Amino acid sequence: MGVNETQLAQKVIQMGAFTSVFTLKPEQQKATLVLGQEETLLQTMEECSELVAACHQYRRTVLMKGQPTSKTPDEAITNLKEELVDAIICIKELIMILGIDYDELEKIEREKTDRTARRLGL
């Protein structure tokens, strides 16, 4: 990890910018700093692709009954939960290592949910 990445991550941690559901335990913060931006990005991509596969498996196994799959409904749900957690952890780490402001994320989230509500006439 480059000096700028380290300084940025340390500054972000000192600012206490990660509250709420995006709080990382100290050991997670340290591990993320050791891995650096590139490895954190790669790990996030991998975990998100595994989440996509788990969502697809859940859809076929649970929602589209009768589709041949290698998992039982309980296994599909358990796998989906595990992949959700893996992706959430990586997203938290990515937010930290890139120094993304949580308030900005909340603002974007509000804009997107408001837009969806308008489109649905809610």
Please report, for each region that a protein language model flagged, where it lies by residue:
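Flexible "arm" and connector segments at domain edges
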Residues: G2-L122
